[in-house]
Amino acid sequence: MTYSVGNSGVMTEVIWEEGPSLQSPLLVVAFEGWFDAGECATGAIQWIVDQHDARRIARIDPEEFFDFQENRPHVDITADGERRIKWPSLDAHVIENDFPHDLVLLSGLEPRMRWRTFCDSVVEIAHDTKCEMVVTLGAMVAGIPHSRPAEVKGSAASAELARRLGLDRPSYQGPTGIIGTLHDALDSADLPVISLRVGVPHYVAGPPNPKG
């Protein structure tokens, strides 16, 4: 395992387990927290990871980004009786397939601190895996019933990218989460990035939402 040195020459918080050679990869990102109603966004990534037997290629060291009194590690006992500490995870998995694009999937808890440093680490993952585009996933509470099909909306800050993909430009103004901050960092790094988000009925926004 090795830590990554970013383009600026500064040591990042990315710990690599392997350096894969991928085919035109896309980076798909979601984080538990403010923009993950019903755990729809992170649940979608976990479903893809499980269905395609994805392998972990890297992780972001949680030490700098969490208050462990707020997000406490868990103690597990292994099958042979050994005690193991499981820390909050921020893992990058990869899926290599026969499609035009391989997938890099990054998910975990929304960091609680040092967001700019965290975003630098995500940018490094995108650069080091040579991702052609970043797709962020999100879910928000909406005034819709569960009986209607879930509607996915997309946007891109880049006018050219929005036009090419038929997406809206962002219109939201106000407090933001890590996804909004990450979009700014990716734009600054000249990495194409789009946002996909789904509305979740307000009465199922807390527990995992199977419809999302």
Model-derived regions: residue spans:
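N-terminal short beta-loop-beta anion/metal-coordinating cradle
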Residues: T2-G108
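Short beta-strand segments
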Residues: V29-A30, S107-G108, T136-L137, R197-G199
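Conserved active-site and cofactor/substrate-binding residues in soluble primary-metabolism enzymes
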Residues: D36-G43, M113, T117, Q173, ...
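Short, solvent-exposed amphipathic alpha-helical segments in soluble enzyme
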Residues: G43-I48, S121-E124, K211-G212
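Internal, conserved structured core segments that host functional sites
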Residues: H101, L109-E160, L182
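Catalytic cores of processing enzymes, dominated by hydrolases/peptidases
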Residues: G143-G212
